[in-house]
Amino acid sequence: MPLRFGGMDDRALVERQLGRSPRALLRLAARCPYGAPAVTEQAPYDDAGDPFPTTYYLTCPQLVAAIARLEAAGGVERWSGELERDPELAADLERATDEQRQLRRQLAAGQTGRDNGSSLELGIAGSANPRRLKCLHAHAAFALANPGYRLGERVLAEIDPLWPPECCCSGAG
């Protein structure tokens, strides 16, 4: 039985949050404080066998918009520079990247999709080089799904307030 929020099941609410049907959706990985979906976990491959390199996908409209503003203000470049200056932060990213790869192999359960498994070795946000950040949304989603991931948590710490005063999905259903 699907979980329900505001009269909608979670999948329908995620679809509404994204404005499209979610691709390769497996489950919810995190919720906002109000109980709405915030992060989904995706399969490494969609039904057609095409790679889907983002394991944890941010769906909360408030967070998606806030992180888009961070990226537009040079956040990817700034955090890439921080990784070069902070070896402990870089080591934590490497640990999370290894965790991401292990999870993707586990979720694939022996399937290799159209790419013969090459995307299973990609890092967070589908990055071939973990030190070259691509998408802060994916790092924030990883941190919400796996508390303790420092880079994602530091990105989230830039959003004030992290969550809106009331649920941004409260009009659903």
Model regions: which residues?
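Preference for intrinsically disordered or flexible, low-complexity segments
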Residues: P2-G173
